């Protein structure tokens, strides 16, 4: 322990690891008054509480983070890009994201003190890197919560036929309340219990969508054989339109942003490999089958999300089945950002364990505040969905691609056991870096162009509008 404190003294930017459960200093945390509370039982209990995650539950929470209703936007991406490019991109991006998640896992094992993605910025670039990535991390997570508020609003509107004139703001408020309530459990081991419901929900919604669209198409003139799907991109495809479709596929694999946060709660972090491989293969299967099958059943007129193509009645059924995934997948982002902020503000305070009255008050306050901010942003910005696309291009390109490449070159490169393997990994990580830069540049351009097109066609709504979104 003396060497750790000497390291901190010599390097102010060093991130010191949290003490392990058998560390004699585990209880030496500060209370509300700032004094040391020697070997406090709450600290020992709290430390154990936040180290209960095994690889199976890690897989579940990664699924909650990664697989949401956005998977039903992939048939629309396939309709734009064509069946062959769609399948190649879906499988290829999935394999690349499995690898970049592996790099993130290796980085966590080499630097156990990294508790959230922002911390790796300090390891690689010092304080300025920490602050920049922290800003990206918090903003993107809050925007994702906001997107689930809007998705919930659309869902309620579809199920209730827009509530016979009910203001859509009411549906937004109801969605925000549900997101807040589901974010109350502070540990990911607890969230994983909801994750099983989440996974069954999205699988059932996808299955209903595929069956319903298949039946509708088979009953039309000419049957399934008459559906005009294509192997190749549609004619007159613009760069912006094409890259938005590519972005929908890329962003479907954007689970890396929360991987450090989840791994920090594992009791055996080295088991992460099982989780990322399992998740990656599940995602590749679901996304490729969903995108390809629904596009083949509906054709170029497929709606986004695709369950809207299932017909009025079955769209309501599918949305109802998907209700858990809309809110559980959204609430986990609130948990991640709340955990990060509390651990940043009170790194040595028993509050961060959320097992005292003061800890629970702070936790509920952060959950409520983040959900409120997400709702306000989602309702106040008329082009919020497009702004989310810009932020995703700016930030997820880093979290999933070029930051892991930089981690490899700055942290894990020397772990390669042979020169040939090192050269291969050098090339692979250069490819990841180039992909990230391409998404950053072209993706941002495509999202901005889409906003301009929507303004030109009068498709941008007003702030806090009561108009139905469904």
UniProtKB/Swiss-Prot annotation:
Question: Using the chain's own numbering, where are the disulfide bonds?
Answer: none
The alphabetical list of record keywords is:
Amino-acid transport, Membrane, Transmembrane, Transmembrane helix, Transport
Subcellular location per UniProt equals: Membrane
- Region (Disordered) spans which residues? 1-21
Membrane topology term reads: Multi-pass membrane protein
Transmembrane parts of this sequence: 57-77, 78-98, 132-152, 169-189, 191-211, 237-257, 276-296, 317-337, 358-378, 387-407, 428-448
Q: Which GO terms describe its cellular component?
A: membrane
Where is it mainly found? membrane
Which residues are on the Cytoplasmic side of the membrane? 153-168, 212-236, 297-316, 379-386, 449-470
Q: Which residues lie on this side of the membrane: Extracellular?
A: 1-56, 99-131, 258-275, 338-357, 408-427
Please list the residue ranges that the record marks as compositionally biased, kind Basic and acidic residues: 1-11
Q: Which GO terms describe its biological process?
A: amino acid transmembrane transport
Pfam families per UniProt: Aa_trans
A GO molecular-function annotation: L-amino acid transmembrane transporter activity
Q: Which family does it belong to?
A: Belongs to the amino acid/polyamine transporter 2 family.
Q: What does this protein do?
A: Required for the transport of neutral aliphatic and aromatic amino acids via the N system.
The protein's name: N amino acid transport system protein
Organism of origin: Neurospora crassa (strain ATCC 24698 / 74-OR23-1A / CBS 708.71 / DSM 1257 / FGSC 987)
């Amino acid at each position: 322990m003396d060497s750790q404190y000497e390291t901190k003294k010599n390097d102010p930017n060093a991130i010191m690891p949290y003490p392990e459960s058998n560390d004699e200093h585990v209880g030496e945390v500060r209370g509300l008054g700032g004094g040391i509370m020697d070997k406090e039982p709450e600290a020992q209990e709290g430390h154990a509480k936040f180290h209960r995650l095994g690889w199976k539950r890690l897989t579940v929470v990664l699924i909650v983070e990664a697989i949401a209703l956005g998977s039903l936007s992939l048939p629309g991406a396939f309709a734009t890009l064509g069946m062959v490019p769609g399948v190649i991109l879906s499988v290829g991006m999935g394999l690349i994201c499995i690898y970049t998640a592996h790099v993130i896992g290796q980085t966590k094992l080499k630097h156990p003190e990294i508790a959230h993605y922002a911390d790796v910025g300090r390891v690689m670039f010092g304080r300025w890197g920490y602050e920049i990535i922290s800003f990206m991390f918090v903003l993107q997570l809050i925007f994702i919560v906001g997107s689930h508020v809007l998705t919930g609003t659309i869902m309620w509107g579809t199920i209730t036929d827009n509530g016979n004139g009910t203001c859509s703001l009411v549906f937004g408020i109801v969605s925000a309340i549900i997101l807040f309530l589901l974010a109350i459990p502070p540990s990911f081991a607890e969230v994983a219990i909801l994750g099983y419901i989440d996974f069954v929900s999205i699988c059932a919604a996808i299955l209903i969508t595929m069956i319903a669209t298949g039946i509708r198409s088979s009953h039309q003139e000419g049957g399934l054989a008459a559906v005009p799907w294509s192997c190749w991109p549609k004619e007159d495809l613009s760069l912006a339109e094409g890259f938005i479709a590519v972005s929908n596929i890329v962003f479907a694999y954007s689970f890396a942003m929360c991987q450090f946060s989840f791994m920090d709660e594992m009791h055996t972090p080295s088991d992460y490999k099982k989780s990322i491989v399992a998740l990656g293969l599940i995602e590749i299967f679901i996304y490729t089958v969903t995108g390809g099958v629904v596009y083949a059943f509906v054709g170029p007129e497929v709606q986004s999300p695709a369950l809207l193509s299932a017909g009025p009645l079955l769209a309501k059924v599918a949305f109802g089945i998907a209700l858990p995934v809309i809110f559980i997948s959204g609430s986990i982002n609130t948990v991640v950002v709340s955990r990060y902020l509390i651990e940043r503000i009170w790194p040595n305070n028993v509050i961060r364990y959320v097992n005292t009255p003061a800890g629970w008050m702070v936790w509920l306050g952060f959950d409520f505040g983040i959900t409120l901010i997400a709702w306000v942003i989602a309702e106040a910005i008329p082009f919020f969905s497009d702004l989310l696309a810009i932020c995703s291009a700016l930030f997820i390109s880093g979290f999933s691609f070029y930051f892991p490449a930089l981690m490899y070159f700055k942290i894990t490169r020397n772990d390669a056991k042979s020169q040939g393997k090192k050269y291969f990994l050098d090339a692979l990580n250069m490819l990841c870096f180039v992909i990230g830069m391409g998404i950053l540049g072209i993706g941002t351009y495509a999202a901005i162009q889409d906003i301009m097109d929507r303004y030109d066609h009068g498709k941008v709504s007003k702030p806090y509008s009561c108009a139905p979104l469904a």
